[in-house]
Amino acid sequence: MTTTPNQGTSHAPIFDLVTDVFGTGRHKPNRTGVDTISGFSKHYTVDLQEGFPLLTTKDLSGFRWNSLIHELLWYFSGEEHIRTLREETGIWDAWADEEGHLDTAYGRFWRRYPVPEEGLAGEAWPDDGHRWMNDEGTFDQLAYVLDTLDENPNSRRLVINAWHPANAAVSTLPPCHYTFVFNVQGDELNLHLTQRSGDIALGVPFNLAAYAILAQVVAQRAGFELGSFAHTIVDAHVYCGAGERGAWYGDHLDELQSRLADVQSPDEYLDVREWLLDAAPEEADGEEDYDHVPGLLLQASREPRERPALDVADVPLEDLSFEDIVLRDYDPADGIRFAVAE
């Protein structure tokens, strides 16, 4: 059993991401019909030795934790459908058909990446008998990384990619967090994630926690200490509501940013929140909580608490189960409701 200690309390990287997008972002409509405040190419780094980085300024336990772990285990499985996953959580139901099939599934690409049946002249491709090839003629990227960490840990080719351009061009929802790279420094294993699109209120906290678990799982099996998790988000955004509510931010974003620039202490975010709720039009029936700005301002007003610890059982990756991943000493603030923009 490997444990991530709970030594740190700082969630400054995520807090800085929120305030950066609020302070420098642009109002931006998008395909969902729910507008955003969007920033370009945002980055943060978290030291995983300071504890498991599950946010404490809102509650991510209970059904949220259940969904997070079962989703990650689904990735590990390599399944292209959600028939097993939907027995535990419905977070992918909106993008699947009645039989549970998806246009794109992360784990399918992690564990079963398509390999061309016929390559062009001069190209190098593994044959069907290669150790990382599956029986169906696909490539197991995760097995490749684990074996390479054992045999050549200083490799700079420890890349896992969930993006297939031809699939993404026609997929209902191509991968958001689409490629990640492991990197060894001394006896520490680090992980860098690149994400094309990141919902700061809902998605990014899940991504941070899930990839921190992934880093711990891989480090444990490869014999390394945990290092850092780094995250680059190309379009980092905060959803700000649909209809009149979303459009209001297009006309008043400068004023919001001016008020945020004057904040001197966490509790002053509540003053900005009160002004916003008084000034902005109410969200329409059926569109409640699509505006994530008030909830994030409430979250920003809260002092972070000590990070929890995470235990992961030392079992083969293929046997890893929900019960093998245990969160300890988690004492978060109350939950905050954010609606999902689909």
Swiss-Prot record:
Pfam families: Thymidylat_synt
GO biological process, one term: dTTP biosynthetic process
EC primary class: transferase
CDD domains named in the record: TS_Pyrimidine_HMase
Keywords assigned by UniProt, alphabetized: Cytoplasm, Methyltransferase, Nucleotide biosynthesis, Transferase
GO MF annotation terms: thymidylate synthase activity
Reactions listed under catalytic activity: dUMP + (6R)-5,10-methylene-5,6,7,8-tetrahydrofolate = 7,8-dihydrofolate + dTMP
SUPFAM superfamilies, A to Z: Thymidylate synthase/dCMP hydroxymethylase
Location of this chain's protein in the cell: Cytoplasm
Chief site of localization: cytoplasm
Catalytic activity, EC: 2.1.1.45
InterPro entries attached to this UniProt entry: Thymidate_synth/dCMP_Mease, Thymidate_synth/dCMP_Mease_dom, Thymidate_synth/dCMP_Mease_sf, Thymidylate_synthase
GO cellular component, one term: cytosol
Consequence of gene disruption: Thymidine auxotrophy.
Pathway where it operates: Pyrimidine metabolism; dTTP biosynthesis
Residues involved in dUMP binding: 31, 156-157, 196-199, 207, 237-239
Subunit-structure text: Homodimer.
Function: Catalyzes the reductive methylation of 2'-deoxyuridine-5'-monophosphate (dUMP) to 2'-deoxythymidine-5'-monophosphate (dTMP) while utilizing 5,10-methylenetetrahydrofolate (mTHF) as the methyl donor and reductant in the reaction, yielding dihydrofolate (DHF) as a by-product. This enzymatic reaction provides an intracellular de novo source of dTMP, an essential precursor for DNA biosynthesis.
Family: Belongs to the thymidylate synthase family. Bacterial-type ThyA subfamily.
Protein name: Thymidylate synthase
Lineage, uppermost ranks: Archaea, Methanobacteriati, Methanobacteriota, Stenosarchaea group, Halobacteria
